[in-house]
Amino acid sequence: MSEPILTTKDLKKSYGDLEAVRGVSFSVLRGEIFSLLGPNGAGKTTTISMLSCLLTPTSGTAVIDSYTIPRQSNQVRQIIGIVPQEIALYEELTARQNLTFWGHMYNMGGKTLKMRLDEVLEQVNLTDRANDKVKNFSGGMKRRINIAAGLLHKPKLLFMDEPTVGIDPQSRRRILDMVKELRDQGMTVLYTTHYMEEAEELSDRVGIIDNGRLIALGTQDELKKLVGEQETLRLHFGEGHQANGDATLFTTIDGVLTTTAVNGELILSVKQATAVLPGVVAQANSLGLQIRSIDIEEPNLEAVFLHLTGKGLRDS
């Protein structure tokens, strides 16, 4: 097993009485993609901001490649790359000019910087747009230049904070493929997302975070074992039909373990989906709920989050 490149212990961040991050402890192994998965407001960005030396922790410790935060922040900044959730580019500058600016921030220059500019532009497949102003780029292209900026100085550890938010599916696919290529090249990535499917596709290990606390951590198989042999029934209702007030009535059905209403849909954790379906349909009919469709899902990270918190990842 690889050794950790990052270790946090009881990391906390408070703003007055508000506890944004509440004692988070985890390690990231060299060469892995480690995802922090949680809903908006869970504490993912605050955690990344502390680890990238943008925020000072209220308490706790973090060590990156033997350097301690915040005491050795200058050394840490030299070995990490950051892809922030917000686009960090100058609209009136070209892609190459933006990257040159960020290269200078890392004390890069001359032939070394020029070579790296060409390499990262090729890496994000934007060589042909290098001399175009960023203001003319799509959201997905801006995201890719953001990633290129984080890779310029060949960091040992790359932080990627929700890098696919607000972009089209094709751009999202390019970025996800790029993240996997980085891992294949030996890069260590700490990736935050509220998209369960991204965490499932990318991650070697996942930390599930909610309300500032890390509530579970492990490989996907390890996390899915928390749910046991359960399956998930997801009921979608017709227009004007919502199960919000009726969710608990489905717990009377034999084999139904838990029920949760999320945005008008009904999510049931069940022992065996096919066995409970007739009772579920009958109960919905008796309540006057028109079922549009039913999905049967094997245990996934969404089910794990629901099992641990009683709510869906996007129910926030």
Predicted regions and their residues:
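ABC transporter nucleotide-binding domain
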Residues: 176-271
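Conserved ABC ATPase "signature" region
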Residues: 100, 104-107, 111-129
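Conserved catalytic motifs of ABC-family nucleotide-binding domains
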Residues: 154
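Catalytic Walker B motif of ABC-type/P-loop ATPase nucleotide-binding domains
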Residues: 158-161
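Conserved ABC transporter NBD signature motif
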Residues: 60-71, 75-76
